[in-house]
Amino acid sequence: MHTVIKGTKTVEEFKKLKAYLEQRAKELYEDHKSHWETWRFGDIDKVWIDKDGFICIQYESGDWWHYNEEGEWW
């Protein structure tokens, strides 16, 4: 999983945000995947936070989604 993090001021802040993003991405991925009979997008390739503060996950297929705090995707 490639995690993109911008705007942190300290190494500690970077590490905390990276750990949070990676854990949250795994949770969102598992939930999203559970709603498909056949998941065709592969594993997580890249994770980042967009300009509006939403977590974005790109999968091995190249497809990606935004996720809000409730776990909804679009």
Across the structure, where does each feature detected by a protein language model lie?
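N-terminal non-globular leader segments, chiefly Sec-dependent signal peptides
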Residues: 1-50
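Amphipathic, interaction-prone secondary-structure segments
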Residues: 37-71
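Short intrinsically disordered terminal tails
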Residues: 1-3, 69-74
